Amino acid sequence: MKKIAALFILIALSVSAYSQSDNWFFSFSMGGSLPLGTFVKTDIDNKESGYAKNGFTLLLDATYPVSNHWGLKGMALVNTNPVDRNWLGTKLETRMNAVPISVADADREFLSLKVNSWMWNALLAGPVFTMNFDRVFWDLQVLGGMNVAYLPQQKLQYEKPSNNWYYLDRNTTTTNVSYGLSAGTAFRFPVTDRINLRVGVDYYRSNAKVQYEQVRVTNQGATTLTEKLGSGSANIPIEMISGTIGFVYYLN
C-alpha cells in the first residue's frame, strides 16, 4: 500500500509540474467490495474459483479538469477480500486424497489449514466525464493500469507425530502482476467551498496466476528427503464491485 501511494503521489507531482496546479482536486474514499463471477465461486472442480468473500476497498485519486466536462484521473486502489476457509480446505483435501494420501477421522487433529486474504493494489489512470447539476457533480470514468495481487498463502499440512514424514500443499508464488480495468461513477455533493462529499460505485476486473506444489517430506535421520507429489497453476479472474464514500478536496 505504501509503495502504491508513493508512486501515485510521484505521478501527481510530475503532472502538476506542467499543469495549472490550482485546478486539481483530490479524493479519499473507502467502503465495501462485493466479489463477482468465478472470483466468488466455491466450486472445487473449477480451477478458476476464487473462494472470495465480501471485503474492503480504499480509493485515493487525483483529477485534473481539461474542460468543463472532461478530465484526467489517476487512482490508487487497495482491496482485500477474505477467503472461504471451509470450501478452500475441502478443495485442498480433495487434492491430497488424489495423491493418494488419506486421513482417518481419528487423525484429523494432525491436519491443519492456514490461509490469508486476497489483497491487491492497483495504479490506474484514464479519462473522466463530468456533468454538473447545480453544484452537484456526476462523474463517469474508465481507468486502466497495473494490478499487483498478493496471493492467499494457502497451506494444508498433515503431520502425525508417529509418522516419519509429513504432507504439505502450498503456494509457490506470493505475488502476481497483471493489467487492471475499472469503470465507475460517483456523485460529489458540496459541503464547503473546497470540500465535497463523494459517493461512488466502481467495477473492477483483473486476474492472478496462482501456482502450487504438493510435497512429502521424510525424516531420514540426519537428513530429510523432499518428494514432489504434484504441482499446478490456475489463472483466477479477479472481479468485484465496490461502494465507497469519502471526501473531495479542491485546491482552488
Where on the chain are the PLM-derived regions?
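Positively charged n-region of N-terminal signal peptides that target proteins for export
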Residues: 1-4, 20
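Sec-dependent N-terminal signal peptides
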Residues: 4-13
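Short glycine/proline- and aromatic-enriched beta-strand/turn motifs that initiate or cap beta-hairpins
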Residues: 19-65, 71, 235-252
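Residues on the lipid-exposed face of transmembrane beta-strands in outer-membrane beta-barrel proteins
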Residues: 28-32, 58-64, 124-131, 142-148, ...
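Extracellular/periplasm-exposed beta-strand and loop segments of Gram-negative cell-envelope proteins
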Residues: 35-53, 80-121, 147-178, 206-242
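Repeated loop/turn-to-beta-strand initiation elements of outer-membrane beta-barrel proteins
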Residues: 69-72, 135-137, 194-197
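Substrate-binding/catalytic groove segments of enzymes
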Residues: 192-198, 207-212
